[in-house]
């Protein structure tokens, strides 16, 4: 691996870990790195003069996007939600997608330790879907070139139909679904596959939020009447709160629209804390009354 420049100002500006309580449960937003994707693709039909005010593009029209994972101290054990990109990919891939996840250990590992745990403490890894920027850190490349699960003592949780869909490998999806991110988990027999909405363990509920992919899921953390929702790519940044602000990457944008509509209805009624996986600045917030933005909640 060639020498890489130091972290960008965007990455340097992200605290490695931010923590807070949801009722009696404690959650940690762990910054697993940064990527840069085309701003037009990230905002779909929204005109550039509108989205560029919120997240300015670089000279290649890419915008910085966090790779924000969630660590949950649940009664049933430590749960990690999503894993970032990891560090398996080559220089060409990292250049195209502007990936920053320097060195060994990975930032995800560093973040887990900064939250007071060891990677081996993770008992479940929930994957909202299997795109490379969510499932890439689920596996790693060993010194001899083999690819293995990064959390061999954990069960990996995904919607069963998402895993089936990821193996279809058609031209539209093959750049996002990279088999080396999930096939080693199958080889190690570490999957815990779910179907639809399920209570994973006390305080953690998985809910379908399709549109970005047909079997995308979001994660609810529920305790003492309080709820946090890890949205993942149904709403990747706080700038995507408005219903029609939908990514060009979404396979079924009108389904995304309805997923967001249903989530926002509950988020307003129940005053959810919304957790944004890719927002380069805002880790979480509460939906405003018009469902057009969020107000910041905590650090």
Predicted regions, residues:
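Residue-level marker for buried hydrophobic side chains located in beta-strands
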Residues: 79-81, 126, 156, 228-230, ...
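Metal-dependent catalytic neighborhoods of phosphoester/phosphodiester hydrolases
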Residues: 135-146, 286-288
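Conserved beta-strand hairpin/beta-sheet module of binuclear metal-dependent hydrolase folds
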Residues: 17-114, 218-233
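Short Gly/Pro-enriched turn/cap motifs at secondary-structure boundaries
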Residues: 9, 17, 59-63, 207-212
């Amino acid at each position: 691996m060639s020498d890489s420049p130091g972290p960008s100002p965007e990455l340097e500006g992200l605290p490695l870990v931010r923590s807070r309580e949801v009722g009696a449960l404690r959650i940690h937003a762990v910054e697993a790195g940064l990527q840069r994707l085309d701003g037009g693709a990230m905002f779909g039909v929204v005109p550039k003069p509108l989205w560029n005010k919120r997240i300015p593009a670089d000279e290649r029209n890419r915008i910085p996007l966090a790779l924000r994972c969630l660590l949950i101290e649940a009664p049933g054990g430590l749960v990690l939600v999503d894993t970032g990109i990891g560090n398996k990919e080559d220089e060409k891939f990292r250049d195209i997608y502007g990936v920053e996840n320097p060195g060994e250990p990975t930032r995800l590992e560093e973040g887990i330790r900064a939250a007071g745990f060891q990677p081996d403490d993770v008992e479940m890894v929930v994957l909202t879907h299997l795109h490379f920027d969510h499932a890439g850190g689920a596996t790693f490349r060993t010194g001899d070139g083999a690819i293995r699960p990064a959390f061999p003592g954990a069960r990996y949780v995904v919607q069963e139909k998402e895993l089936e869909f990821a193996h279809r490998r058609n031209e539209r999806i093959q750049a996002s679904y990279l088999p080396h991110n999930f096939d080693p988990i199958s080889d190690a027999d570490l999957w815990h596959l779910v179907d639809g909405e399920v209570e994973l363990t006390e305080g953690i509920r998985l809910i379908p939020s399709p549109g970005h992919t047909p079997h995308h899921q979001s994660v609810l953390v529920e305790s003492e009447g309080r709820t946090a929702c890890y949205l993942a790519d149904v709403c990747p940044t706080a700038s995507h709160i408005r219903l029609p602000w939908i990514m060009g990457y979404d396979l079924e944008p009108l389904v995304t629209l309805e997923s967001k509509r249903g989530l926002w209805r509950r988020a307003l009624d129940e005053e959810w804390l919304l957790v944004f996986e890719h927002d380069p600045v805002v880790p979480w917030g509460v939906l405003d009354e018009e469902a057009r933005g969020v107000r910041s909640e905590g650090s």
